[in-house]
Amino acid sequence: MATAAIALAASATASAQTPPEFYGVVPQGELTDKDIERMGAGRVGTARVTLPWSQIDPTALPRDYLWQDFDEIVAEAARQDVAILPMAFSVPPWVSAMEGCRKPPGGPCEVRPPQTQAGLEAWRSFLAAAVDRYGPGGVFWTLNPTLPERPIRAWQIWNEQNSPGFYQPRPDVSDYAALLSAASAGIRAEDPEAEVVLGGLYRFPLGGDGGGIRGTDFLERLYAQPGIEAAFDGVAVHPYSARLLGMRSQVRRMTSIVDAHGDGQEGIWITEVGWASGGGPHPLNRGPEGQAERLRRAFAWFTARRAALNIRLVAWYAWRDTKGDAVCDWCANSGLLEFDSTPKPAWLEFLRFTGGR
């Protein structure tokens, strides 16, 4: 009873105490203008959205970027006062071929980051072009003078790079350090004050014998890479756990590693956390009411410790349910909204924190 009272008290005052961008969501599948309008009404602070290198940079021709789809997201988000956190991810087929990976498009090559100097330079150039377009004073804002100018100031580099599901042929700390350094160089060449955020680290990566690395081990090894601390400003965590105790312990452990390396100024970004409303056997399936209860207690914990742990964002996975293209056993029902956008009890709990409708 005491825990529930604390959670309710935290949610009642959250919108007055936290920065507007603190509470976020992660879309899975297509993101429409109606989705973003709903986010705006609900006072969603941040949408973490994939910035797909593989789709935007289709050929080796210089600066032949296809920005239209991402332009539409950024434009509607600006209208609705929703911040965008781009998660730069995936590899174009022409870069994969240059790297010697020739699997079909969308296969393992798409999640096999470049390792050669030429591939890393293409990656650096892509990130620089993205910041030049969407950052402060960017081309996008010049081309759209009637939009509220909301430049993107933080950029996330890859997703769950400690998991073979997202990093082929297997997770490698030194390879990721090179990827991160190239991205950071491109971003800061265009916006020296931009924040560079690590890809979200998952506690126990799956992948059979594929060589996943525990999230805490990956972060420790990353800090051991010479000069790498200058390349990033934020550490992202995906603290999935059936129990809230497990979620809390993951965040505390990651924070302790950051503090041990003298990087207390680096923020902790929860770029994915969530439970599902499904009823299957997976431990993250909690049913509709259980999902809402987990959100309420988790968000209350993050809100109460925001300043002490320097938590910059807590983003719920996912925004809306999906059908047929979920990336995990429980993900299809992880949304705050059903597939047809019907709100779940978890969405109502989310609104208690944001003060939205």
Per-range role (PLM):
Residues 102-105, 151, 156, 161, ...:
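Aromatic-rich peripheral "rim/lid" segments of glycoside hydrolase catalytic domains that contact
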Residues 34-35, 56-60, 94-98, 164-167, ...:
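Extracytoplasmic/secreted cell-surface and envelope-processing proteins
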Residues 22, 33, 37, 124-153, ...:
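Noncatalytic carbohydrate-binding groove/subsite architecture in carbohydrate-active enzymes
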Residues 16-52:
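Boundary/entry segment of secreted carbohydrate-active catalytic domains
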Residues 1-16:
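Secretory targeting and sorting signals
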Residues 42-211, 227:
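Substrate-binding cleft and catalytic face of glycoside hydrolase catalytic domains
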Residues 14-17, 355-357:
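Extracellular cell-wall/glycan-interacting regions and their flexible linkers
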